Amino acid sequence: MSNTGSARTEEFTKGTGYEATKPNNDTDDDAKQNYPSKEPHMKLGDYTEETSFVDDSIFKREELTPDRNSPANDVEKMEVPKPTPQWMKLKDEGKLGKHRKNRLRRPGRFPVRQESTIDIPGLTVSKRTENDSNNASYGIREKLIIILVGIPATGKSYIGSKLSRYYNWLKYNCRFFSVGDKRREEGASTYSMSADFFDIKNEETFKFRENVALETLEDLLHWMIHENGVIGILDATNSTHERRKHLYDRISKEADIGIMFLESLCTDDILFEENIKLKIKGPDYEGYDTESALKDLRERVDLYKKYYEPLDERDEQLPFLQYVKVINVGIKVVTHNIEGFLAGQAVYFMLNLNIQKRQIWLTRPGESLDTVAGRIGGDASLTPIGKQYAQDLANFMDRQRVLWQLRYTNDLASTNKRFSLSEASSFNVWSSVRKRAIETIEFFNPDSYNVKKIRLLNDLNLGSREGLTLREFSEKYPDEFDVIKRKDYAYRFSGQGGESYLDVIHRLQPLIVEIERSSGNILVVSHRIVSNILMTYFLNYHPEDIIDVGLPLHTLFCIESDRYGTTCMAYRYDAANRQFIKDPMFDLRKRT
């Protein structure tokens, strides 16, 4: 290249902070800020095999003559950019912290870690290698390990189990690995598991606990690598930076597995005491009386508090590390460096986490003309019996609402809980936008209930098969009809608007999160398949049970959920006597 071109380039870049040589040590601070790297800027010939990702030959073609008409040769005519004024510069501009430098990707054709993008089962497909043809995870390429952090009785296991249920319901292959379960399995015959067992000064038990934690991690890694796992949740206290770094270093040896710490902190004394009373009902205190269990658990908590190291700047130094701090089971959420799609889903869920006790009622629309004719789908109105069901449903819910408020008031008086009574009076009524569903909620007073029609609650769209009877469907399209029996959740029915089960699941995702967020009671009036999908989530059924769960016509289900667990009660409608009768023996998995 000509010297003239170099001179023009030097003149063009002069004063912009992009000169091709490093400034002298006696330059002013502003000039130094333009050179965050300790190494001189590279010239065209200074590249190395480590940093080069382009064919070397392109730098050796000096015989090529530049186009004289190119705008690049009019550099003298171009206005030289002015330096950035000092007042416009960021406080730490040019001074990347160590943890920020670790996130930069090494130049090259193959980056060290590929960026995570959207992965939704049944809706996205990632290109996979020939040796990774198993479709059990529906083409999900990203993998994530969530490591729980926190002292006992802060709610971390509760949060982890809720996350596991949420991911599995969305059809991500997720599994919960409990270090405590493995500790009890391997050490119950040797150790007493009392508070002294958890003392970090007890070298024997400390070594045993460390080994159990690493063994559990190895089980998790084996499952993710060899059994098509997508998300693994490691449940343990992981209370020191040294332990967390050890886990991080081991996981980092495996390719393309994201790591996220999830720390649960509890600063609310009332909530912490409730967690303490809940934890003594767990397997660590089987055979203990209440007083002895409380005493031992408090001693264990005091030991952990003495040595506990919360997530801080030291953890942030670990390359690519993501973490979430959940304070008081979702009252406050703090995040750091959340990049992956799967990690983002966890944060989204944490922001809507709610431990308030509440009722979730589910029912199908009343009997419709299409129901009588045996047709699937469609948009028919209710029959006279269906309208009667709608009227009696509203009356029954009015009575149940009063009973709930009485229970709630008594609960507040007896336990001094921290929630306000006004929350007990909140009641939402949702339905799909189909005629039969809208007519089923017709008798709910909008002045007393928050009534909404939501298109997301529409039933599975069978495309061109809508309006057929089951017999017509099975005879004309036996292959598609067999899809239901084969439980192919990714199969999308043909015809305009046709959906798959996975389409419906992800269509319902924002409603699930909204129900999790809401502190009030709710009645959902939707259709058979949608109701099945909702029931499998709230009752934590296996994801493959979606098709097997049966919600009969004119049956009402009440789910009561809080951090202590979930209960479900069925009420059958007696049309002759116009009343709902509690049925404690009803089995959801038996189709009726």
UniProtKB/Swiss-Prot annotation:
Biased composition (Basic and acidic residues): 57-66
One GO biological process term: fructose 2,6-bisphosphate metabolic process
UniProt-annotated location(s): Cytoplasm; Nucleus
EC number: 2.7.1.105
Residue numbers binding beta-D-fructose 6-phosphate: R300
A GO term from the CC aspect: cytosol
Keywords of the record: ATP-binding, Cytoplasm, Kinase, Nucleotide-binding, Nucleus, Transferase
EC top class, as a word: transferase
Entry coiled-coil feature ranges: none
A Pfam short name: His_Phos_1
Amino-acid positions noted as binding ATP in the UniProt annotation, renumbered to this chain: G150, I151, P152, A153, T154, G155, K156, S157
Region (Disordered) residue spans: 1-80
Main localization (coarse): cytoplasm
Active site, UniProt feature: D235, C266, H527 (proton donor)
One of the record's GO molecular function terms: 6-phosphofructo-2-kinase activity
Catalytic activity: beta-D-fructose 6-phosphate + ATP = beta-D-fructose 2,6-bisphosphate + ADP + H(+)
InterPro entries: 6Pfruct_kin, 6Phosfructo_kin, His_Pase_superF_clade-1, His_PPase_superfam, P-loop_NTPase
Function statement: Synthesis of fructose 2,6-bisphosphate.
Protein name: Probable 6-phosphofructo-2-kinase C222.13c
